[in-house]
């Protein structure tokens, strides 16, 4: 399962994904119009989708609206610095992978404040049936508003992501692929005030006030 683990001084986010496989990847070629990306099939999709294109063409900033059951979150995706992550995220959004899915976990400890979404199974263990490499600089930080990918270890990104609604200390192991408008974080802050059920052994649990994704669309 994907999980957030607290360690002294620094928090490490290990958001688990289902077991991976080693099937045929989707790849592209570097070119003037895009960036080559490789997506490796794992055969364990929580909801069936096609692999993303093997070439990322969204290589600039992309505006999206993350519509939740509790309000809209306007976000800017970093296609310029994390093109393969943004390519996957947009592909999943366009295929309806995220539509009508729960956000199964929230953490409310000061310094560790995130909402985890992107698993149609609602277990924090599901994914899209493929994984791909991290896009890290080594200098990642996770202030409020950060939009980042969950993982279960190096290069295991899939569909699950987390939104940081309060400044959070994590090791720089999680691809930061966008930011959520500060004004919209109140949607999550209100949910956080009601706490969680404490069922996740690594911290946090299901929000006591449920929240889920309705859709993700380009703005």
Q: Locations of the language-model features?
A:
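Cyclophilin-like peptidyl-prolyl cis-trans isomerases
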Residues: 2-219
């Amino acid at each position: 399962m994907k999980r957030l683990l607290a360690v002294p001084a620094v928090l490490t986010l290990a958001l688990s994904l289902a077991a991976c496989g080693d099937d045929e990847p989707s790849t592209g070629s570097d070119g003037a119009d895009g960036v080559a990306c490789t997506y490796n099939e794992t055969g364990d999709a929580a909801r069936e989708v096609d692999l993303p294109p093997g070439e990322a063409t969204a290589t600039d900033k992309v505006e999206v609206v993350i519509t939740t059951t509790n309000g809209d979150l306007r976000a800017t995706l970093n296609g310029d610095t994390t093109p393969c992550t943004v390519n996957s995220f947009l592909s999943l959004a366009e295929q309806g992978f995220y539509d009508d899915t729960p956000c199964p976990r929230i953490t409310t400890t000061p310094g560790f404040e995130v909402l985890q979404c992107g698993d149609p199974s609602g277990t924090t263990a599901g994914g899209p049936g493929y994984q791909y490499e991290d896009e890290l600089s080594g200098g990642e930080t996770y202030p409020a508003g950060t939009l980042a990918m969950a993982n279960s270890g190096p290069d295991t990104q899939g569909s699950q992501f987390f939104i940081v609604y309060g400044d959070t200390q994590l090791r720089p192991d999680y691809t930061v692929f966008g930011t959520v408008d500060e004004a919209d974080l109140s949607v999550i802050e209100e949910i956080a005030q009601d706490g969680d059920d404490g069922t996740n052994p690594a911290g946090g649990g299901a929000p006591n006030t449920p929240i889920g994704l309705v859709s993700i669309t380009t703005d």
